[in-house]
């Protein structure tokens, strides 16, 4: 049986690390990408004991040539999980252009690379509950209207619909999963919930 190969963008994050661990247990070859400024920030992978089991590649989602290089190098990729983003809402207000270039157009660049190099690749886009913005409904689902309230949320809406468009227009297996806040021991200490729990531990 052929060993499957998966690319995970944003491998150094909470979700990237747990997903890598899960796929490795299923005997996948895992290629993890991260931006140059995150190089060496692999403490989550070390904590899970998988740091040396992953093929690492630097890849800036703002650069077409870097994305194309990865797809040219790894010709037998089966799945791509796009978890990378400029994911801080406050930062997105300070740097809306950079946020859009990475979070919105980065998704488009990956999907275009899949269209150009290998349309058999299955693509997963990590969408965000931030797309809903301020809503009146108690619960949200796929039919809840989007009301993005930040450059980050707007970028995620763009990525969400771009994924849908590539699925319908180019017959690519491209899906989105809408993620709400979720916690774990690998959650970054810069997030509010982690600050609260760390503060409670010190009491």
PLM region spans:
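N-terminal Rossmann-like NAD(P)+-binding domain of SDR-like oxidoreductases, especially those catalyzing
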Residues: 1-184
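Alpha-helical substrate-binding/gating segment
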Residues: 168, 194-203
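Glycine/proline-rich active-site loop of Rossmann-fold NAD(P)-dependent oxidoreductases
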Residues: 157, 182-198
